[in-house]
């Protein structure tokens, strides 16, 4: 999982990426390409 300050560029890496909020943290998840998973931090 990649950790980044801003998720804007990580969200644009693939068209299936979506931003979700879990337990106070913001994540980018991708159901089709798992390698695009990321967290803000």
Curated annotation (Swiss-Prot):
InterPro entries xrefs: Ribosomal_bL36, Ribosomal_bL36_sp, Ribosomal_L36_bact
Gene Ontology biological process terms from the UniProt entry: translation
GO cellular component, one term: ribosome
Keyword Iron found: no
A GO molecular-function annotation: structural constituent of ribosome
Keywords: Ribonucleoprotein, Ribosomal protein
Family to which the UniProt record says this protein belongs: Belongs to the bacterial ribosomal protein bL36 family.
Name assigned to this protein: Large ribosomal subunit protein bL36
Originating organism: Cereibacter sphaeroides (strain ATCC 17023 / DSM 158 / JCM 6121 / CCUG 31486 / LMG 2827 / NBRC 12203 / NCIMB 8253 / ATH 2.4.1.) (Rhodobacter sphaeroides)
Source species taxonomy: Bacteria, Pseudomonadati, Pseudomonadota, Alphaproteobacteria, Rhodobacterales
Gene transcribed to yield this protein: rpmJ
């Amino acid at each position: 999982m990649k950790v980044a300050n801003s998720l804007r560029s990580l969200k644009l890496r693939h068209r299936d990426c979506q931003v979700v909020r879990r337990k106070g943290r913001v994540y980018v998840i991708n159901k089709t390409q798992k390698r695009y998973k990321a967290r803000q931090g």
